[in-house]
UniProtKB/Swiss-Prot annotation:
Example GO molecular function: structural constituent of ribosome
Entry-linked Pfam families: Ribosomal_S2
Family according to the record: Belongs to the universal ribosomal protein uS2 family.
GO cellular component, one term: chloroplast
Gene, per the UniProt record: rps2
Protein name, UniProt field: Small ribosomal subunit protein uS2c
UniProt record, GO biological process: translation
Cellular localisation: Plastid, Chloroplast
Database matches in SUPFAM superfamilies: Ribosomal protein S2
Amino acid sequence: MTKRYWNIDLEEMMRAGVHFGHGTRKWNPRMAPYISAKRKGIHIINLTRTARFLSEACDLVFDAASRGKQFLIVGTKNKAADLVSRAAIRARCHYVNKKWLGGMLTNWSTTEKRLHKFRDLRTEQKTEGFNRLPKRDAAVLKRQLSRLETYLGGIKYMTGLPDIVIIIDQQEEYTALRECITLGIPTISLIDTNCNPDLADISIPANDDAIASIRFILNKLVFAICEGRSSYIQNY
């Protein structure tokens, strides 16, 4: 895998608050190598390590995108939800940003059935099929469609398991991470100072609570994916 330059600037990361970890009482001792200091009761993340692992992650996603691989971005907490959907749409990735339904990957056959149902209902709605039904039946189907749109809208075009999963908050998305580990799907995960750095294939130490921090990391990864996709299209 070729190493590339991704213009990851330490001062820009500081302005985004990427270096602010959790309070010193809420930490995972395994994060010690990624912490540079304690300040006013919080741990400070070593941004040199952040830059190194973010660069590795960018190399990985660029390489995968240049070979036509598929990505899934997972971030369901309120702060991250809009950032995740916008980033995923920009890079033509699948995403989950509302709620992770247990077994979404490990029980893929069930997820596929839900997706087929979702597509059928969307087609029915577009062709005004609901208007031909009794009002009560139409209302039930509309509620079903709304629920499926909320939870599966970001993966509606997914036809198989993703090749790489990007996780925005390890603690929040632990179930998704465990499913990826079970299936052997490579993962990239933001890890704050209360996380376990040994679970994901590439762990990026960063503040996973601040919107600016999440945006900074996502923007770099999305840029790398888009660059990789351009390379894939040109070489196809």
